[in-house]
C-alpha cells in the first residue's frame, strides 16, 4: 500500500474517504471541526442525534457532505481526549483499516494530528499507527486454493501540520521497513516444515544476498560444521534426514573495520523433541521453533530497507530435531566448538545446543554486541505469558538499551536475573555442563547455559517462546516479533 504524508486542509482534499476523529466529549477539534463548519454542521447534527458516542473504535460513515470534496467521511471514536494508550491506538488503526476495506474506495485520507497518545511524540504516534495499519494488511494464504479477497484500498494519505511533516515521513519510512521485516518473519514462521527446512532457509538467504551488493552470504553445511568442531550443533541434527545449515549474512552498511552488531537466531525448523519426544497435542506448532531465526531474517530485511549506516552480522543456526535410529540419546556427551563438553540429559532442550556453537562462532567477528533470539523455554511462557519477551544478559548497558528499544517500539521485554547461584543447577558428574538444570527457573538456567559461551563479548538473550506466535483459533500464526524491538535497537545505534 502506498503511503503519503501531506499538510493541507482536510475539507479541500479529493478522496474516496476522509477519516476524522471524535472523542467522548464530542467537542469537535481539528479536522472534524473544519469539516463540520464547511459542511454546514453535518457532523454536529449526527452527534446531537446520538449516532456516535465517541468511544474508542466506534465508527460512523457519512456520505455526500456538501462543500466537502471527499466522497465519504468516516467518523472514528477515540475515547477520552489525550488518554489513548499504545494498545488503544493500534486498535483504532485496526478499526479504521477494517472499515476502509469494507468500502469501495481505492484511497483514504487520515487526519493523524487529532490523535493524542500518552507518552508519545509525533514520530512515535505516527510510527505505531502505520505499523498497525501494515499489520492489518498481512495475509498468509499461500496454500489456500481460494485466496483472500483483494481489497481496492491502494493508497493512504496521512495529514499533519507543516512542522510535523518531516517527523511523520521519517516515522512512516521506519514503520514500513519494520512492517516489511515482520511480514517476512511471519511468512517464514507460517510456512509448513516440509517446505521451510534448513536448506530452504539457506536458499532464501542466498536470494537476499544476490539482491543486495553490501550483503555477503555464507552457507555452512554439515561437513563445514564438523570442520569447525560444532559437535553440539551436529548432535541435534543427526536424527533428521534434513541436513543442518549455519547461515551467515554479513551486512556492510557502516565503515570498513567498524565492529558489527551480531544477531544469532535459533532455527529449529521442526522440533519433535527428539528421543525425549513431545506430546502429540500441539506438536504442529513446533514449526514455529525457528521463529528466532525468522526474526533475524526479518530484522535484516528492515535494515536493508533502511540502509542503516552500521555493520550487522546475522547468524542462523538451522536444524531439525527428529527421533530416529541415528538420533542423539539422553546421556550422550558432545564436545562444543568452544571445547566444553555437554551431557545431553534431555534432547528436547536442543535450542541451546545449536546456539552455543553459533555463539562461539560469533567471536570471530569481534562484535560490539551479540544478541541471540530464540523460542527457547516453555518456562518463559509460564513466567511472562504471551505479551512480553524474556531478556537476560551479561551487560547492564546492553540490557537497558534493549529494554528502551522495546518500550519505544511497543515490543516489550522484561529482564530476568542471571545470578551465579543458578549456574550450579547445570553441574554434571560426567561432563563440563548439563544441557538442563532441573524444573526450577528454566528460562534462567537456559540463559546460564548460553552464558558459558559468551564470555568474549557483550551479550543479551531474548527468549521469545511466548511472543513469537499465537496458538490456536483463527488468529493462529507467527507474530513477527521481536523485529520491532531489534530494529529499534539498531536504529538507535545508527542514530537515525
Swiss-Prot record:
Its cofactor is Mn(2+). Coiled coil: none annotated. Pfam families: Peptidase_M17, Peptidase_M17_N. The active site is at 278, 352. The keyword Hydrolase applies. GO terms for molecular function: manganese ion binding; metalloaminopeptidase activity. Keywords: Aminopeptidase, Cytoplasm, Hydrolase, Manganese, Metal-binding, Protease. CDD domains: Peptidase_M17 (cd00433). InterPro entries: Leucine_aapep/pepB (IPR011356), Macro_dom-like (IPR043472), Peptidase_M17_C (IPR000819), Peptidase_M17_leu_NH2_pept (IPR023042), Peptidase_M17_N (IPR008283). Its EC number is 3.4.11.1, 3.4.11.10. The keyword Aminoacyl-tRNA synthetase does not apply. Binds 2 manganese ions per subunit. Presumably involved in the processing and regular turnover of intracellular proteins. Catalyzes the removal of unsubstituted N-terminal amino acids from various peptides. Belongs to the peptidase M17 family. This is Probable cytosol aminopeptidase. The lineage of its organism: Bacteria, Pseudomonadati, Pseudomonadota, Gammaproteobacteria, Pseudomonadales.
Amino acid at each position: 500500500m502506498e503511503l503519503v504524508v501531506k499538510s493541507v486542509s482536510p475539507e479541500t482534499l479529493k478522496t474516496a474517504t476522509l477519516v476524522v476523529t471524535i472523542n467522548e466529549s464530542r467537542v469537535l477539534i481539528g479536522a472534524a471541526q473544519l469539516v463540520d463548519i464547511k459542511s454546514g454542521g453535518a457532523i454536529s447534527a449526527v452527534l446531537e442525534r446520538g449516532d456516535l458516542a465517541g468511544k474508542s473504535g466506534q465508527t460512523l460513515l457519512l456520505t455526500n457532505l456538501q462543500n466537502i470534496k471527499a466522497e465519504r467521511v468516516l467518523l472514528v471514536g477515540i475515547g477520552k481526549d489525550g488518554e489513548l494508550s499504545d494498545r488503544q491506538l493500534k486498535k483504532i488503526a485496526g478499526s479504521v483499516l477494517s472499515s476502509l476495506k469494507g468500502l469501495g474506495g481505492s484511497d483514504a485520507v487520515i487526519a493523524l494530528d487529532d490523535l493524542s497518545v500518552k507518552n508519545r511524540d509525533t514520530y512515535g504516534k505516527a510510527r505505531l499507527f502505520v505499523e498497525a495499519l501494515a499489520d492489518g494488511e498481512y495475509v498468509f494464504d499461500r496454500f489456500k486454493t481460494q485466496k483472500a479477497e483483494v481489497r481496492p484500498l491502494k493508497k493512504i494519505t496521512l495529514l499533519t501540520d507543516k512542522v510535523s511533516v518531516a517527523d511523520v515521513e521519517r516515522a512512516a519510512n521506519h514503520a514500513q521497513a519494520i512492517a516489511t521485516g515482520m511480514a517476512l518473519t511471519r511468512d517464514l514462521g507460517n510456512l509448513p516444515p516440509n517446505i521451510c527446512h534448513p536448506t530452504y532457509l539457506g536458499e532464501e538467504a542466498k536470494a537476499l544476498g544476490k539482491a543486495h551488493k553490501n550483503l555477503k552470504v555464507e552457507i555452512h553445511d554439515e561437513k563445514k560444521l564438523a570442520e569447525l568442531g560444532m559437535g553440539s550443533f551436529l548432535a541435534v541434527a543427526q536424527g533428521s534426514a534434513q541436513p543442518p545449515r549455519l547461515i551467515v549474512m554479513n551486512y556492510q552498511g557502516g565503515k570498513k573495520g567498524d565492529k558489527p552488531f551480531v544477531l544469532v537466531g535459533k532455527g529449529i525448523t521442526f522440533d519433535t523433541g527428539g528421543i525425549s519426544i513431545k506430546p502429540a497435542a500441539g506438536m504442529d506448532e513446533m514449526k514455529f521453533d525457528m521463529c528466532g531465526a525468522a526474526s533475524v531474517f526479518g530484522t535484516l530485511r528492515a535494515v536493508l530497507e533502511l540502509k542503516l549506516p552500521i555493520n550487522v552480522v546475522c547468524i542462523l543456526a538451522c536444524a531439525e530435531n527428529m527421533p530416529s535410529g541415528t538420533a542423539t540419546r539422553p546421556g550422550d556427551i558432545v564436545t562444543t566448538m568452544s571445547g566444553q563438553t555437554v551431557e545431553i540429559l534431555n534432547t528436547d532442550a536442543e535450542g541451546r545446543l545449536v546456539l552455543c556453537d553459533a555463539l562461539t562462532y560469533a567471536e570471530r567477528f569481534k562484535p560490539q554486541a551479540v544478541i541471540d533470539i530464540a523460542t527457547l523455554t516453555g518456562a518463559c511462557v509460564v513466567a511472562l505469558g504471551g505479551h512480553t519477551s524474556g531478556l537476560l544478559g551479561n551487560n547492564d548497558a546492553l540490557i537497558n538499551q534493549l529494554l528502551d528499544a522495546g518500550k519505544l517500539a511497543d515490543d516489550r521485554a522484561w529482564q530476568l536475573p542471571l545470578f551465579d547461584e543458578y549456574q550450579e543447577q547445570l553441574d554434571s558428574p560426567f561432563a563440563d555442563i548439563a544441557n538442563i538444570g532441573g524444573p526450577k527457573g528454566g528460562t534462567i538456567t537456559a540463559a546460564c547455559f548460553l552464558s558459558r559461551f559468551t564470555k568474549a563479548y557483550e551479550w543479551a538473550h531474548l527468549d521469545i517462546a511466548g511472543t513469537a506466535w499465537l496458538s490456536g483459533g483463527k488468529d493462529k500464526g507467527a507474530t513477527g516479533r521481536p523485529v520491532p524491538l531489534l530494529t529499534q535497537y539498531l536504529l538507535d545505534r545508527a542514530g537515525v
